[in-house]
Amino acid sequence: MLFSSIPFLFYFLPPVLLLYFLTPDRWKNLTLLLSSLVFYGWGEPRFLLFMLAAIAQGYAFGRLMERYPRHKRLFLILSAVLSLSLLGYCKYAGFFLRTLGALTGLSLPALQIALPIGISFYTFQVLSYVVDVYRGTVPPQRDLLQLATYVAMFPQLIAGPIVRYADIAPELTRRHHTLTDAAAGARRFVVGLGKKVLIANVLYELMSAFLQSTQPSVLFTWLYAVACALQIYFDFSGYSDMAVGLGRIFGFHFPENFRYPFLSGSVTEFWRRWHISLGSWFRDYVYIPLGGSRCSRSRWLLNVFLVWGLTGLWHGAAWNFVLWGLFFAVLRAAEKLWYGHGLEKTRLLKHLYMLPLLAVSFVLFHAADLPAAGQQIAALFGFGGLPASGVESLYYLRSYAVVLVIALLGATPLPAKAVQRLRNTSAGSAVLSVAEPVALVLLLAACTAYLVDGSFNPFLYFRF
């Protein structure tokens, strides 16, 4: 079930909210957990077993570490092996068999394994909890209900952000519910829904038009690349906004996942602003334990390439994702070793540097396969014998110009700053007190109309 769907918005969420706020505080976690299990099992109930198994082993090994501290390293290894084996089988077994068959020429069976929704997210949450217990960062949770609620909580279950146990442990035990928090959460949710439905979905239509085009051109390929970058951003950040907003309504404060990444002047800065919870997870649980940057240059390079290769692989079991991660590894290493300091000289230089790199990266990320990625990236820079523009490219540029401009502005802090300036004046604050609720209602109505119409409603990170 997607947040941006009629069943969720009108059949699931309203009764869950009503039941949750009617429930006494001591039973709120149980209500939230049961609601989350219904949410997760809505489409494929059998996948509940995978998630419940992940929760059970995380809880068991956390308790075993507490009871037998001498053997906690063994328990950590066993827990990690179980978690990663389940993820590896479900998500990567088919990919590795295909790769092995291609390399060796062997006729290996083609595995068709259904991927449990959100397994990459909840696996990382369980792993981080067990590692933190091992390190002594957090005490083991003795209440299975609280740990299960942390892992299975539907606002962040299928698409993050990757919430660490320490981030919300106090709120699992006791949290405050206020009208202010609920209103702020609802506002954040509706804005995220608008980003997802009215911008990301519309941009996906432009991307689909390019992929089906019989008149490709350099201009059309650049339109596609820009649409890719903006669509993935509004798709995922919109979903993250909805998750953070829902968490706020239920009394939780989830970490932010995006901070205007397209304003970045380097790849290093970009990954401090893009999918922050994933980047910080790999930093704290893979990169630093490997030695981070406090080691020899060759070891540091190995660490960087390993972490970024895994980051790419986390996003999908395909070589374009692996190369996408390694592409950022090369850039990250080059910035640190050679030209990173030079980028700081002028703001214009930094953004001119990032523009083609982001275009290449998002085309590679979204490509159906490596040959398609190669053709599209070559077309960006005028290779392949394509014309500079064509009838189709000019038609789609005119047709989607308004959405592209709105998306480009929405990817900057300008709208938020404008609203804040209004809020800082008495007259502006009075206007916003009326205009903001009306605008949110109209935005929700527009999103609902789009969804009722049966328009295309994809979500890329749903597959992770």
Segment roles from a protein language model:
Residues 1-463:
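Membrane-embedded transmembrane alpha-helical bundles that form the catalytic cores
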